[in-house]
Amino acid sequence: MALERDFEKFTGGPVVSTRDRMHVTLSHTGIIYFNQNTHRLLGNPAAAALYYSRERDVIAIEPASPRIEQNFPIKPLQSGWRILAGPFVGHNGIRTDHTLRFVHPDIENGVLLLGMRDTVNVTPRRYKKKK
């Protein structure tokens, strides 16, 4: 069947479930959250060293030993994992008023790379209460 000219092809593709993709967020309080899949792809680490490139505006999370004091513990949270990265975020001047989702998190040579310029606001809307 030939399509008429008024049809437009949808090029967005299907939605990939959060179970099958990497999902990473940064909250306004400095909590880095990632799902089970991301934790598994990192090698299921118990702690991580955190790095920041001001030039590229990228956060790097490298699996590390929990025995080294400056490494951040990775703790379970609901169906994922969290890093309490407040000191890291404050030290590097990373500010956000919202929870941000990293659109294209990537793992290179075992290091998770999170581009601060490649984020979307995922903070739930606050609705005004009716009087």
Language model features with spans:
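Long, contiguous, secondary-structure-rich segments that constitute the structural scaffold
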Residues: A2-I31, Q36-N37, L42-K131
